[in-house]
Amino acid sequence: RTQLSPEVRPAFFFADDVPTSVRDSLEFAFYAAITEWGNFGPIEYWVVGADTQAAERLADRFCEHRVQRGDLSQEECEEIGPRRAEFVEYASRAEAMLISGHPFIDAGWNGGLEWGLHLFSSSYPPGWAGLEDARPEDDQTVLFHEYFHAIQNAHLDTLDWSERQELMGPVWWVEGGAEFMAQVATSRLRAS
């Protein structure tokens, strides 16, 4: 799959409790990854905050967006309970993180190839949220790591999931490659 023009911008979707400063930091880092490695979109990036009701609303927006694009019917989207459950779980864990002060982040490349895009989701990024003992640099590296999975997947010419898994190779290779590339790129960019 070829790279897209830089004018084809990622679509970011944030829960309504995610502050503007966090949104701006995430978008800036994502554009840095695109500048570093090229634009392998179209891309959707869904970010949950720390409020479960806001996460529910984001899940509603996810379904509305899928229906509007013609990817799924409303009924099909509502049957995909794991996405809603994932958003609510992310918010619950982020709320606990803010109370405890123990940072964590869940993020992932979630496929989307059947809809002609790369789909990502993320919990509340603790470094960009300003949580003590959390470094924004770690959030940047996580984002670069996940974007590298889109690059890995963009170079496979089949939509058959089993065949894709076989072509990607062992999990340690896929994850190790993404982590290596993310660490090297973010370290170099921060040093420049």
Model-predicted regions and their roles:
Residues 4-6, 29, 137, 164-165:
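Alpha-helical protein-protein interaction elements
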Residues 15-105, 140, 144-147, 154:
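Zn2+-dependent metallopeptidase catalytic core
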Residues 5, 21, 25, 73, ...:
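Generic serine detector
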Residues 2-4, 35-38, 111:
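Short, conserved catalytic or adaptor-binding loops enriched in Gly and charged residues
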Residues 2-20, 121-129:
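Acidic/histidine-rich, surface-exposed loop or edge segments in extracytoplasmic proteins
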Residues 8-12, 41-45, 117:
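Hydrophobic beta-strand segments of well-ordered beta-sheets in folded domains
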Residues 108-191:
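Zinc-dependent metallopeptidase catalytic helix centered on the HExxH motif
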